[in-house]
């Protein structure tokens, strides 16, 4: 598996040049969109990328604690604890966080998608959403393996409780839905309660 940080660092990131009274300023495209309060989760959820997203959330809250943040998600999931650090920060800050799935939101990606501001959780028409229980592997002494198995069970219960909170489904329904890889269309995810709307086009701005 390629290191996601190497992939990002070696990628050709478009630059945006702006003119001002002080001359030209160049921004990479993600920094420019951050000025518009747009942040991204692209690729696997892991510690370094999660810390960048947490930092962006905290920065935008410090700039304006009442203004909406748009969080675009295209992720196959990844490390549970990394995802939970993003989740907890989304719940912690005062800004409402709108979530939008483009491409896919699987595993921890789906949890972050459904954790957005109620009424403001969206997916594009061809997005795919997948939920399942956490998985992990461990080698070592039998006692340590049992300890890790209990930890995975505890994480499974906690993740189920988070889905219950944000979907409005009862615990047994969530438990059953997450027992195996459960792929959904955007419409099915809306019916299940993971998102609020499937959107094809950006809404027109309200008339002044």
From Swiss-Prot:
Compartments, as annotated in UniProt: Cytoplasm
Family to which this protein belongs: Belongs to the peptidase S14 family.
Listed name of the protein: ATP-dependent Clp protease proteolytic subunit
PROSITE patterns named in the record: CLP_PROTEASE_HIS, CLP_PROTEASE_SER
InterPro entries: ClpP, ClpP/crotonase-like_dom_sf, ClpP/TepA, ClpP_His_AS, ClpP_Ser_AS
Subunit structure, as described in the record: Fourteen ClpP subunits assemble into 2 heptameric rings which stack back to back to give a disk-like structure with a central cavity, resembling the structure of eukaryotic proteasomes.
Gene Ontology CC: cytoplasm; endopeptidase Clp complex
One Pfam family from the record: CLP_protease
NCBIfam families linked to this entry: PRK00277.1, PRK12553.1
Key words, A-Z: Cytoplasm, Hydrolase, Protease, Serine protease
